[in-house]
From Swiss-Prot:
The active site is at D109, E133, H273. Catalyzes hydrolytic cleavage of carbon-halogen bonds in halogenated aliphatic compounds, leading to the formation of the corresponding primary alcohols, halide ions and protons. InterPro entries: AB_hydrolase_1, AB_hydrolase_fold, Epox_hydrolase-like, Haloalkane_dehalogenase_2. The keyword Transcription regulation does not apply. The keyword Hydrolase applies. It catalyses: 1-haloalkane + H2O = a halide anion + a primary alcohol + H(+). Monomer. Residues 32-155 form the AB hydrolase-1 domain. Keywords: Hydrolase. It holds the Pfam family Abhydrolase_1. It comes from the Bacteria. This is Haloalkane dehalogenase. GO terms for molecular function: haloalkane dehalogenase activity.
Length: 300
């Protein structure tokens, strides 16, 4: 039976980016293996996966701006924490961390859009990409599971503010609802901590669903996703697709599409969306094997 550790992995470190303090984990030595979370999580999501990669490289996991232990933006409002603003902060942090030229990316949720985008811009610096429950193509509402479609349509309406900023729906309902097991109180409190204060401190959890590329909107995010997916569907960059069963956002036609990408290995693990909380051992072992194969092929 899988043991689900509750303690964070590693020791948090901090760097100032554009006047704001950003938190990250940076453990071990060697070529970088970069783990990137999405909404509404943090580097805490990777706590039971990163130990499987010890000894295989430098393990880096950053908290997005306004999330985890990173600072909040001020003043805040509906125009803050857009994809573009999140990207500017994260890419500046990655640049400051000097990740080197043999990066392996491990991506989930919005961390996948950010990582795919970065990889597309730095193709000669990425050795391979592992991804799960990722944003791989623009979507339509028909692609969304009926059980959550209404909630996400609500986030993208004027009701989004009370849903997310007052009632903390993304943390209190969406997160636990997309995990097969029940998180402990201690685990939930780690995820609650960045958003314990109501109002604008919770803005990132609302801006992210409003940035999802659904039915052609927002146009700039749709264009960006089309740009990186056009590259991913033709590049021989080694890929590891960690398929979730039953899954949430990579299902049906989108799963079929992802399976067309070249030079890709696939494993299937139990999970809905936050698969790291249901299958950390299987995911960690698969990524470790993937990295060993990449390093061996590169003669490292």
């Amino acid at each position: 039976m899988t043991a689900f550790g509750v303690e964070p992995y590693g020791q948090p470190k901090y760097l100032e980016i554009a006047g704001k303090r950003m938190a990250y984990i940076d453990e071990g030595k060697g070529d970088a293996i970069v783990f990137q979370h999405g909404n509404p999580t943090s580097s805490y999501l990777w706590r039971n996966i990163m130990p499987h990669l010890e000894g295989l490289g430098r393990l880096v996991a950053c908290d997005l701006i306004g999330m985890g232990a990173s600072d909040k933006l001020s003043p805040s409002g509906p125009d803050r924490y857009s994809y573009g603003e999140q990207r500017d902060f994260l890419f500046a942090l990655w640049d400051t961390l000097d990740l080197g030229d043999h990066v392996v990316l491990v991506l989930h949720d919005w961390g996948s859009a950010l990582g795919f985008d970065w990889a597309n811009q730095h193709r000669d610096r990425v050795q391979g990409i592992a991804f799960m429950e990722a944003i791989v193509t623009p979507m339509t509402w028909a692609d969304w599971p009926p059980a959550v479609r209404g909630v996400f349509q609500g986030f993208r309406s004027p009701q989004g503010e009370p849903m997310a900023l007052e009632h903390n729906i993304f943390v209190e309902r969406v997160l636990p609802g997309a995990i097969l097991r029940q998180l402990s109180d201690e685990e939930m409190n780690h995820y609650r901590r960045p958003f314990v204060n109501g109002g604008e401190d919770r803005r990132p959890t609302l801006s992210w669903p409003r940035n999802l590329p659904i039915d052609g909107e927002p146009a700039e995010v749709v264009a960006l996703v089309n740009e990186y997916r056009s590259w991913l569907e033709e590049t021989d960059m080694p890929k590891l697709f960690i398929n979730a069963e039953p899954g949430a956002i990579i299902t049906g036609r989108i799963r079929d599409y992802v399976r067309s990408w070249p030079n890709q290995t696939e494993i299937t693990v139990p999970g809905v969306h936050f698969v790291q909380e249901d299958s950390p051992e299987e995911i960690g072992a698969a990524i470790a094997q993937f990295v060993r194969q990449l390093r061996s092929a590169a003669g490292v």
